[in-house]
Structure formats: C-alpha cells, structure tokens
Amino acid sequence: MNLSNLKPAEGSTKTRKRIGRGPGSGLGGTSTRGHKGAKSRSGYSKKIGFEGGQMPLQRRVPKFGFKNINRVEYKAINLETIQKLAEAKNLTKVGMNDFIEAGFISSNQLVKVLGNGSLTTKLDVEANAFSKSAVAAIEAVGGNAVKL
C-alpha cells in the first residue's frame, strides 16, 4: 500500500453536480433554476430582510426611542461600600485606583458616589460625580468630596 494507490471507501464520495453542461448530463436546460422569473436570472439575490412580500420584521415591529450617543454612564458606588473598603484597607483617602484594585470598576469606567449607607470615619473621596446626599454625608463626618 502506497500513497499513490489509496482510494476512498466505496460509496463514501459522490460525483459533483455539473450544472448546465447539456441535456445528456440530466442537469442541462434550466440548470436547476426552474422556468423564468428573477430567481432564474444571473445576478439575482433577494434583499436582506425580504420575506417574500410579507411585511418584514424590521417594519412590523414598532420603533421607539434611540440611543443617545452623548450619554455618560456612571458606575454607582454607595457610601456603605466605601466605608467597608476604607475599614478593610485602613484608608483615609479613597480614589479611583482603590475602586479599580477592589474590583468595583474597570479602568475606563466613571464613578458616581451615592448616599446609601453611612460613613463613620473621616474620608476624602475622589470620584467623577456625587449625589447631594453623598456629599452631605461625607462632609458631615468631616471629609471631602473631590470631583474629578
């Protein structure tokens, strides 16, 4: 047995359909395209989303609203979370790097500090945005809310 005399197993391969090679081939004439109509012509392709004349899905479903390209999304972090982080790492100043190291945000996200929970230690908090209640709670303990 050599590479030169290997053959596929009996019945494992089929001969290719050679379309449009005369009536004797069995696939001549209309060449499997039927008679007339757009689908029989060269260059035909139906439009994307075309459903045979039925109203297509993208026109049946109502269209509401849009995505504002100028929207700024913030990751919300509450005061109770900041308090736990400060206690765990014994911090007096909490900033973006601390949030990234703790896994609260990724490096390209913006942070908004919200006022849920309470602070018991004096902290300087750096973030991109603060709610009014968060600023009030931070300053009530003697800390600073630094907007980046």
Swiss-Prot record:
Specify the species. Answer: Phocaeicola vulgatus (strain ATCC 8482 / DSM 1447 / JCM 5826 / CCUG 4940 / NBRC 14291 / NCTC 11154) (Bacteroides vulgatus)
* Source species, domain of life: Bacteria
Provide the family line: Belongs to the universal ribosomal protein uL15 family.
Name a Pfam family for this protein: Ribosomal_L27A
The answer to whether UniProt assigns keyword Protease to this entry is no
Bias regions of kind Gly residues — which residues?
21-31
Q: Per its record, how is this protein called by name?
A: Large ribosomal subunit protein uL15
Task: Please name the gene that encodes this protein.
Answer: rplO
User: What is the annotated quaternary arrangement, including any partners?
Assistant: Part of the 50S ribosomal subunit.
- Function description: Binds to the 23S rRNA.
Tell me one GO molecular function of this protein. rRNA binding
Q: Which SUPFAM superfamilies match?
A: Ribosomal proteins L15p and L18e
Query: InterPro entries this protein is in?
Result: Ribosomal_uL15, Ribosomal_uL15/eL18, Ribosomal_uL15/eL18_sf, Ribosomal_uL15_bac-type, Ribosomal_uL15_CS
Coiled-coil-forming residues are: none
